[in-house]
Amino acid sequence: MKLTCVLIITVLFLTACQLTTAVTYSRGEHKHRALMSTGTNYRLPKTCRSSGRYCRSPYDRRRRYCRRITDACV
């Protein structure tokens, strides 16, 4: 009986800790932790002027595309 009460109190305490950290993260710019990674790393594919150079503008007539990791033309 005592063990059951201790386990219930522990679970409630850990749940409360999770809820307080979730509220702390939602006060910032990002409402949810999962949105942090998608907001900063997501990029649309850009086109390049020539291969080997860094990507400049999203539109180009030569239709070469950038790598998302290195941001270099392919």
Curated annotation (Swiss-Prot):
Per UniProt, what does mutating D71 to A/N do?
A: 4-fold decrease in inhibition of alpha-9-alpha-10 (CHRNA9-CHRNA10) nAChR (ribbon isomer (I-IV; II-III))
Q: Which organism is it from?
A: Conus generalis
UniProt-annotated location(s): Secreted
Q: How is it modified after translation?
A: The native disulfide bond pairing has not been studied. Three isomers may exist: the bead isomer (I-II; III-IV), the globular isomer (I-III; II-IV), the ribbon isomer (I-IV; II-III). They have all been synthesized and their activity tested. All of them show similar potency on alpha-9-alpha-10 (CHRNA9-CHRNA10) nAChR, showing that disulfide bonds does not significantly affect their activity. In addition, removal of disulfide bonds does not affect the activity on alpha-9-alpha-10 (CHRNA9-CHRNA10) nAChR either.
Signal peptide region? 1-22
Name the domain of life this protein comes from: Eukaryota
InterPro entries from the UniProt entry: Conotoxin
**Known tissue expression:** Expressed by the venom duct.
- So what family is this one in? Belongs to the conotoxin O1 superfamily.
Q: What else is known?
A: Negative results: this toxin (both bead (I-II; III-IV) and ribbon (I-IV; II-III) isomers) does not inhibit voltage-gated calcium channels from DRG neurons (Cav1.2/CACNA1C, Cav2.1/CACNA1A, Cav2.2/CACNA1B and Cav2.3/CACNA1E).
Name of protein: Alpha-conotoxin GeXIVA
Residues excised as propeptide:
23-46
User: What is the protein's known function?
Assistant: Alpha-conotoxins act on postsynaptic membranes, they bind to the nicotinic acetylcholine receptors (nAChR) and thus inhibit them. This toxin is very potent on alpha-9-alpha-10/CHRNA9-CHRNA10 nAChR (IC(50)=4.61-12 nM for the bead isomer (I-II; III-IV), IC(50)=7-16 nM for the ribbon isomer (I-IV; II-III) and IC(50)=22.7 nM for the globular isomer (I-III; II-IV)).
* Region annotation (Interacts with alpha-9-alpha-10 (CHRNA9-CHRNA10) nAChR) ranges: 56-64
